[in-house]
């Protein structure tokens, strides 16, 4: 396996402006929609990481303690999900067959814990907000030839990226190469 590398930042023109083609996904074909989201997450991961970082920095500037608490709770919830999936076959099957439900459960547990701790609004704006915007963009953005080539290189293992490792941990490795 090659070393993990962050891909280059995609041009703003490619990401959201001029050449960016956006279209609503077909809700009747959820598998194709899932492939589009996963492939866009892999291709634009550096741009998404930057957007997430900016959102987190803004929330951290306004409410630093609640932002740190939000990040810690979500990280622990994701860690528990990955650990449970690695040690328990039933959880692994559930995670692979219902990835959206597992992600929603992690976010719901995070929101519940933070609601009890008083940081629910900060969680919604600092973590859930940017994640929602990233998923909306990944759903709407149509793939181009360059995107498809980069994803094939990732899927055959010639290049490893942080998003590829995250998708693998969430049980989406079989989807990522499609």
UniProtKB/Swiss-Prot annotation:
Tissue: Strong expression in the brain, small intestine, lung, spleen, and pancreas as well as in tumor tissues of the breast, colon, lung and ovary, with a weaker expression in normal tissues of the same patient. High expression in neuroblastic tumors. Strongly expressed in Purkinje cells and more moderately in cells of the molecular and the granular layers in the cerebellum. Detected in neuronal cells, but not in non-neuronal cells in the cerebral cortex, hippocampus, and lateral ventricles.
Assigned keywords, A-Z: Endosome, Membrane, Protein transport, Transmembrane, Transmembrane helix, Transport
One matching Pfam family: PRA1
Residue intervals on the Extracellular side: 63-64, 120-122
Transmembrane feature ranges: 42-62, 65-85, 97-119, 123-140
Membrane topology category: Multi-pass membrane protein
Keyword Secreted set for record: no
Main location: membrane
Any one GO CC term of the record: endosome membrane
Location(s), subcellular: Endosome membrane
Membrane-side (Cytoplasmic) residue stretches: 1-41, 86-96, 141-178
Single biological process term from Gene Ontology: L-glutamate transmembrane transport
Job of this protein: May be involved in ER/Golgi transport and vesicular traffic. Plays a proapoptotic role in cerulenin-induced neuroblastoma apoptosis.
Entry's family note: Belongs to the PRA1 family.
Subunit text: Interacts with CCR5 and GDE1.
Name this polypeptide is given: PRA1 family protein 2
Gene: PRAF2
């Amino acid at each position: 396996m090659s070393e993990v590398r962050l891909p280059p930042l995609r041009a703003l023109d490619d990401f959201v402006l001029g050449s960016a083609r956006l279209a609503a996904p077909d809700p009747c074909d959820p598998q194709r929609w899932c492939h589009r989201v996963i492939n866009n997450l892999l291709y634009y991961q550096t741009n998404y990481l930057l957007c997430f970082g900016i959102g987190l920095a803004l929330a951290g500037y306004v409410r630093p303690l609640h932002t740190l608490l939000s990040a810690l709770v979500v990280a622990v919830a994701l860690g528990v999900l990955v650990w449970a999936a690695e040690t328990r076959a039933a959880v692994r099957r559930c995670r692979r067959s219902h990835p959206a439900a597992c992600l929603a459960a992690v976010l719901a547990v995070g929101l519940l814990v933070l609601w009890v701790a008083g940081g629910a609004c900060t969680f919604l704006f600092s973590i859930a907000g940017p994640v929602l915007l990233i998923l909306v963009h990944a759903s709407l953005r149509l793939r181009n030839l360059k995107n498809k080539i980069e994803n094939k290189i990732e899927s055959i293992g010639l290049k490893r990226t942080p998003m590829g490792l995250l998708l693998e941990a969430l049980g989406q490795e079989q989807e990522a190469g499609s």
